[in-house]
UniProtKB/Swiss-Prot annotation:
Organism of provenance: Hordeum vulgare
Motif ('HIGH' region): 50-60
Residue sites binding ATP per the record: 57, 256, 291-295
Location(s), subcellular: Plastid, Chloroplast; Mitochondrion
Name of the protein in its database record: Glutamate--tRNA ligase, chloroplastic/mitochondrial
Length: 560
């Protein structure tokens, strides 16, 4: 292509660039759902385009979520496109893992590599013919040219730019080379790239739906490569061709892609495609305000899934990283989010990932599950670790109901149940906190309790459940002239071995049921009522009293 032909094309590109690529939107337009969110009268089509080179990062998951919510809230299409042009790092296993994680989150897509669609293929590695077709169009129009510069020549240009303290833009001769010079190199078989001609003057502006007006000076860019010498297309060229030919109306992505928008806008213009609207969301930050990375702990969706987090909790928490509905409400189902999500409420400042808040959020969603699902989750967890041996007795149901308020992660249910079934009487009676309980004639309560158990009275009451317990404890209190805290605190310590915990009546009834049903495995640390009363009978109360006054050694035998 002769240089004179290109210069005419370049001049036309420069003159028409700003009004064609970036129609100015008023502040009012940016704030309204109709113009800013809908992108005009065409259908809403958004995409999430992961690279299958690793696990799905929470940042990528949030980007996918925002795209999903935007599409679903406007009756649009959510497209999944796999950007696998990095052939060395891309793997099928990683692609499958990303798709699995998206499905686990409940982010179903309308078009994608697994289900197809009208605008496929949906893997970049399968779209090379399309990229070559559009690269040829740019070559024929004069928007790109062949560059025969070697790596050594390009490196020298960078060194020169550094010495001159100017942006390292392309300064080679091939932008203005004659047809004869180009033909000579082609005949020699010299490798070449395709470079895009960038206007040397002017600026480019876009109105980002989140960040507002963003502009770049074109003289800082320089001519850039769109096709490598091995025929592989470059990222920005692929993305532009893909978004244009897939008719993407809105590009919602991370702010780290904002610099790419300049190159992509130029390619859109040169190919004659309409520009989508752009929305660049903030990065997710670590508590120290640095970019969230593996050194800060778990960062992938798969890791949180393995740790026992619920998908609905992950979705809820990720949505709140940079978005809110303007109220104090923090609990949202995915249907709530679809109903309330608007792009104008996405914050442009960085959002801090708080693992503690995520765990709290998971607890909220765990406890909001229908009772049958909640119980099944607990039961499945206990069975998977071998703690629960059977569930016919109703033990799992009662244990789940008793423990759910203190559990935020289902994987914590193991430790919670083991703690509930344990009997650390030795540690409790030896503690400073128990001193007042011991001094309140605890030995007398223990003596009466042992008598009630040996006679079968207590066992019968527990077998009758809560009604039986209430009758028995009322009678026991009258006999020993105790009520309120002076009755229930000693009973809690003597029967559970603890000063604090879930409701005492439910705890003791559950311990009784565990002993009679054989519901739990020995490795749970379960101490039966029989074993508890054996320990109680061996307590040397006189020695314990002295120990409280001057601690030397334990007066309470440890549970075996």
């Amino acid at each position: 292509m002769a240089a004179s032909n290109f210069m005419g094309s370049s001049a036309r590109l420069r003159v028409g660039l700003l009004p064609s690529v970036t129609p100015r939107l008023s502040r009012r337009a940016l704030a309204t759902r109709a113009s800013a969110d809908s992108g005009g009268s065409g259908p809403v089509r958004v995409r999430f385009a992961p690279s299958p080179t690793g696990n799905l990062h929470v940042g990528g998951a949030r980007t996918a979520l925002f795209n999903y919510l935007f599409a679903r809230s406007r009756g649009g299409k959510f497209v999944l496109r796999v950007e696998d042009t990095d052939l060395e790092r891309s793997t099928k296993k990683s692609e499958e893992a990303v798709l699995t994680d998206l499905s686990w989150l409940g982010l179903d897509w309308d078009e994608g590599p697994d289900i197809g669609g009208d605008f496929g293929p949906y893997r970049q590695s399968e779209r090379n013919a399309l990229y070559k077709e559009h690269a040829q169009k740019l070559m024929e129009s004069g928007a790109v040219y062949r560059c025969f510069c070697s790596n050594e020549e390009l490196e020298k240009m960078k060194e020169t730019a550094n010495r001159m303290k100017i942006p390292p833009v392309y300064m080679g001769k091939w932008a203005t080379a004659s047809d004869a010079e180009v033909q000579q190199e082609l005949e020699k078989g010299t490798p070449y790239t395709y470079r895009f001609r960038v206007p040397k003057e002017g600026s480019l502006k876009i109105n980002d739906l989140i960040r507002g007006e963003v502009s770049w000076n074109l003289n800082t860019l320089g001519d850039f490569v769109i096709m490598r010498s091995n025929g592989q297309p470059v990222y920005n060229f692929c993305v532009t061709v893909d978004d244009a030919t897939m008719r993407i109306s809105h590009v919602i992505r991370a702010e780290e892609h904002l610099p790419n928008t300049l190159r992509q806008a130029l390619i859109y213009k040169a190919l004659g495609f309409a520009m989508p609207l752009f929305a660049h969301v903030s990065l997710i930050l670590a508590p120290d305000k640095s970019k969230l990375s593996k050194r800060h702990g778990a960062t992938s969706v798969g890791q949180y899934k393995e740790m026992g987090y619920l998908p609905q909790a992950m979705v809820n928490y990720l949505a709140l990283l940079g978005w809110g509905d303007g109220t104090e409400n923090e609990f949202f189902t995915i249907d709530d989010l679809v109903e309330k999500f608007t792009i104008d409420r996405v914050n442009k400042s960085g959002a801090v990932f708080d693992a503690t808040k995520l765990k709290w959020m998971n607890g909220q969603h765990l406890r909001s599950l229908p009772s049958d699902l909640l119980i099944k989750d607990f039961e499945d967890q206990w069975r998977s670790t071998g703690i629960l041996l059977e569930s016919e007795s109703g033990f799992a149901k009662e244990a789940a109901e008793l423990l759910k308020e203190g559990i935020d992660l289902i994987t914590d249910a193991d430790a919670a149940l083991c703690k509930l079934l344990s009997y650390p009487l030795h540690e409790t009676l030896s503690s400073d906190e128990a001193k007042s309980v011991v001094e309140d004639k605890l030995s007398e309560v223990a003596s009466g309790l042992i008598s009630a158990y040996d006679s079968g009275e207590l066992d019968q009451a527990l077998a009758e459940g809560h009604d039986g317990w209430k009758k028995w404890v009322k009678s026991f209190g009258k006999t020993h002239k105790r009520k309120g805290k002076s009755l229930f605190m000693p009973l809690r310590v003597l029967l559970t071995g603890k000063l604090h915990g879930p409701a005492m009546d439910s705890t003791v009834i559950l311990v009784h049921k565990a002993g009679t049903s054989g519901a739990v495995a020995p490795q749970s640390g379960f101490v039966s009522l029989d074993e508890r009363f054996k320990i109680l009978k061996e307590v040397n109360w006189e020695s314990l009293q002295k120990q409280q006054e001057s601690p030397v050694e334990s007066a309470v035998p440890a549970a075996s």
